């Protein structure tokens, strides 16, 4: 049993590492430095139109794995509000990195949608991994 638990944890660790690498590739390293600049602090400013709506869906989907896997890795993030806050902080870190490296626009809409995605993933994880009574 211990071997199987360690094996499962190792597998989850590898998945988390791959997920974080993919997030950084998609949100930062895939873009040329200095190619995108700007700050959007107005909530819902980027919504509307098919392309913008696709970005909304993309941002939500991008963070569902965060909410799903991260609480399984770190016990301190197993409560829903804590996990959602961690998703917010991770999203904020990405947006600040994009701003500082000029590899993306800093948008509060992205932070909101990413946080929603982390929350959805956390709820799915809580339901999926709930212990039976």
Label every model-predicted segment:
Residues 1-108, 122-133:
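Bulky hydrophobic segments
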Residues 112-120:
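Small-residue-rich transmembrane alpha-helices that serve as helix-helix interface/gating elements
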């Amino acid at each position: 049993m211990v071997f199987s638990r360690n094996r499962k944890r190792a597998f989850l660790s590898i998945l988390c590492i791959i997920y974080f690498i993919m997030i950084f590739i998609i949100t930062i390293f895939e873009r040329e430095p200095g190619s995108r600049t700007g700050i959007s602090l107005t909530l819902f400013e980027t919504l509307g139109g098919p392309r913008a709506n696709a970005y909304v869906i993309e941002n939500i989907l991008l963070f569902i794995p965060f909410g799903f896997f991260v609480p399984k890795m770190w016990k301190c993030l197993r409560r829903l509000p804590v996990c959602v806050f961690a998703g917010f902080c991770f999203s904020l870190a990405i947006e600040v990195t994009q701003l500082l490296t000029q590899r993306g626009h800093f948008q509060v809409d992205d932070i909101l949608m990413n946080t929603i995605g982390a929350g959805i993933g956390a709820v799915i994880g809580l339901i999926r991994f709930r212990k039976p009574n």
